[in-house]
């Protein structure tokens, strides 16, 4: 089958693969086409970094799926983290560091537990499993640190197939944020998701608290067919 690999420069590479191919195999094919050594390649699908020993079918990668290729840069860089008190912290990081890693570095410097940290860049809240390069955070970028006063909560999302997904959210999360979290877990694009709670379809710009969605509430996920109404 054919799959596509999109690079950060926007170039798209087409590969011939089989479902049983491992991620290592795919990286070798990319090396054959593009000359990039496998150890410098990170492949992302549905917000997840793909592990070398696993196969395409393990990740439910099907024909004409698009993977994203991020290069692991050698050597580190400095970034800045600005707190609400106006203090600026300097961190030594690598592009391949995850947001969790960055929060741990902040904990080492400032003693703030990672679960109380929210990091913002370009107006977006950064998610733990993603990397700095996923968000195009480069040397000398400035992140903003906001403290989570109350912890988050769990909610459930039930699909039409009967599967239930558990999400970590905050009352202040917008419906868009929730759809992004579902995309990270399930690979379903937000524009194909409709979320229903208490018989109402939820609108993107509104928050969970707007709809009185509390901990352990269950939302229902309905898929929008392409070309539908």
Curated annotation (Swiss-Prot):
SMART domains: UBQ (SM00213)
Cell compartment(s), UniProt: Cytoplasm; Nucleus
Propeptide residues per the UniProt entry: 229
GO cellular component, one term: cytoplasm
Record keywords, A-Z: Cytoplasm, Isopeptide bond, Nucleus, Repeat, Ubl conjugation
Signal peptide from the UniProt entry: none
Cross-link Glycyl lysine isopeptide (Lys-Gly) (interchain with G-Cter in ubiquitin) residue location(s): 6, 11, 27, 29, 33, 48, 63
UniProt cross-references to Pfam families, sorted A to Z: ubiquitin
Residues of the Ubiquitin-like domain: 1-76, 77-152, 153-228
Main location, first listed in the record: cytoplasm
Record function comment: Ubiquitin exists either covalently attached to another protein, or free (unanchored). When covalently bound, it is conjugated to target proteins via an isopeptide bond either as a monomer (monoubiquitin), a polymer linked via different Lys residues of the ubiquitin (polyubiquitin chains) or a linear polymer linked via the initiator Met of the ubiquitin (linear polyubiquitin chains).
Other comments on record: Ubiquitin is encoded by several different genes. UBI3 is a polyprotein with one copy of ubiquitin fused to ribosomal protein eS31. UBI1 is a polyprotein containing 3 exact head to tail repeats of ubiquitin.
Protein name as catalogued: Polyubiquitin
């Amino acid at each position: 089958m054919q799959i596509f690999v999109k690079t950060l420069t926007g170039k798209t590479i087409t590969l011939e693969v089989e479902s049983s191919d491992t991620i290592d195999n795919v990286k070798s094919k990319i090396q054959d086409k593009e000359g990039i050594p496998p150890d410098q390649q990170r492949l992302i699908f549905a917000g997840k970094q793909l592990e070398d020993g696993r196969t395409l079918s393990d990740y439910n990668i099907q024909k004409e799926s698009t993977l994203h290729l991020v290069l692991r840069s050698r050597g580190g860089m400095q970034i800045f983290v600005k707190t609400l008190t106006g203090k600026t912290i300097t961190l030594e990081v690598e592009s391949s560091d995850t947001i969790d890693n960055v929060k741990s570095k902040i904990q080492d410097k400032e003693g703030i537990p990672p679960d109380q940290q929210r990091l913002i860049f370009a107006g977006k809240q950064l998610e733990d499993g993603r990397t700095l390069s996923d968000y195009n955070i480069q040397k000398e970028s400035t992140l903003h640190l906001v403290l989570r006063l109350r912890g988050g909560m769990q909610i459930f999302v039930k699909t039409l197939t009967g599967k239930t997904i558990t999400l970590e959210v905050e009352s202040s999360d917008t419906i868009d944020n929730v759809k992004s979290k579902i995309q990270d877990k399930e690979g379903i694009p937000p524009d194909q998701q409709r979320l229903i709670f208490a018989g109402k379809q939820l609108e993107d710009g509104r928050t969970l608290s707007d709809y009185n969605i509390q901990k352990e509430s269950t939302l229902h996920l309905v898929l929008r067919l392409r070309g539908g109404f």
